[in-house]
């Protein structure tokens, strides 16, 4: 496995693979890798000839009161897991390498972001599409791999790819979970022992919502209330940041219960904000 830190070296390595007619799979991450990330790598390994992973904590997707400086980082750990997982190139740039000068242009997401994380984290998805635009140009992948846990991000990135004709196929991989149902996340390390014990209730509540919809329930308020009551059976969380249903991938009110729907939750704990979701009537790419 090659560890590359600068753009030019990465572009040269990618060009070499392209000249050899190798297909490239790309797994963009912010590091502190866990089994969820490695599942993406596993899919890339099976579906493409050459796997590139980026580890970059992107400052432009963090708000002024968010955890950029505190976000967990462990390059040695990441490199070990990446190599064991079959990554061919680990791209670990500095902030200066990705943002060498002040931006002269700005990407602004105008759809699919008025609710959920888009509403709670103003400017977050602008930062996401900015860094992914840069990374897609550098890596020039055939496939890019994302986890369903970040379903709103996936919808936004799908819009980016469609709007700007990026020649990349997005592969959306089901959320990887702990044995008790908690979605794997780098932020799980922030949970206290009690919070970690109770956090699986998020997934349990979402499953209740799915069961209601699958049984024919269309009273949105009732569905949300049942899920809210389930989460509030546990007491370690500070608040439910959101618990809602929307059409997917549009993130507009549900008008047709036979089409794509997302049930999404974000729950705030003392030092972590956890997100999770269930997708209904949605085909993964």
From Swiss-Prot:
InterPro entries according to UniProt: Cyt_trans-like, Pantoate_ligase, Pantoate_ligase_C, Rossmann-like_a/b/a_fold
Catalytic reaction list: (R)-pantoate + beta-alanine + ATP = (R)-pantothenate + AMP + diphosphate + H(+)
Compartment(s): Cytoplasm
Residues binding ATP, per UniProt: 30-37, 147-150, 176, 184-187
GO cellular component, one term: cytosol
SUPFAM superfamilies: Nucleotidylyl transferase
Keywords linked to the UniProt accession: ATP-binding, Cytoplasm, Ligase, Nucleotide-binding, Pantothenate biosynthesis
One GO biological process term: pantothenate biosynthetic process
GO molecular function, one term: pantoate-beta-alanine ligase activity
Function as written in the Swiss-Prot or TrEMBL entry: Catalyzes the condensation of pantoate with beta-alanine in an ATP-dependent reaction via a pantoyl-adenylate intermediate.
Miscellaneous comment as given in the Swiss-Prot or TrEMBL entry: The reaction proceeds by a bi uni uni bi ping pong mechanism.
Family named by the database record: Belongs to the pantothenate synthetase family.
Protein name: Pantothenate synthetase
Species assigned in the record: Listeria innocua serovar 6a (strain ATCC BAA-680 / CLIP 11262)
Lineage: Bacteria, Bacillati, Bacillota, Bacilli, Bacillales
The gene coding this protein: panC
């Amino acid at each position: 496995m090659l560890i590359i830190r600068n753009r030019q070296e990465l572009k040269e390595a990618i060009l070499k693979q392209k000249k050899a007619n190798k297909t490239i799979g790309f797994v963009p991450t912010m590091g502190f890798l866990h089994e969820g990330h490695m599942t993406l790598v596993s899919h890339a390994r099976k579906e493409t000839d050459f796997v590139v992973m980026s580890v970059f904590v992107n400052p432009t997707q963090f708000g002024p009161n968010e955890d950029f400086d505190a976000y967990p980082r462990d390059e040695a750990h990441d490199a070990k897991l990446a190599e064991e997982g079959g990554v061919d190139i680990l791209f670990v740039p500095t902030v200066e390498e990705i943002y060498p000068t002040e931006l002269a242009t700005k990407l602004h997401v105008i759809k699919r972001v008025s609710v959920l994380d888009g509403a709670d984290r103003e400017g977050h998805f602008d930062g996401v599409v900015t860094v992914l635009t840069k990374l897609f140009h550098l890596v020039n992948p055939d496939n890019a791999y994302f986890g369903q846990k970040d379903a709103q991000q996936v919808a936004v990135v799908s819009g980016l790819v469609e709007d700007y004709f990026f020649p990349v196929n997005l592969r959306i991989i089901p959320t990887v979970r702990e044995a008790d149902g908690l979605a794997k996340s780098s932020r799980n390390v922030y949970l206290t022992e009690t919070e970690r014990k109770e956090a699986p209730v998020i997934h349990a509540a979402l499953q209740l919502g799915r069961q209601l919809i699958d049984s024919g329930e269309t009273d949105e308020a009732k569905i949300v209330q049942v899920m809210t009551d389930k989460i509030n059976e546990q007491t370690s969380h500070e608040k439910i940041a959101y618990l809602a249903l929307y059409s997917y991938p549009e993130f507009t009110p549900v008008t047709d219960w036979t089409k794509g729907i997302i049930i999404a939750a974000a729950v705030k704990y003392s030092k972590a904000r956890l997100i999770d979701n269930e997708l209904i009537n949605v085909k993964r790419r």
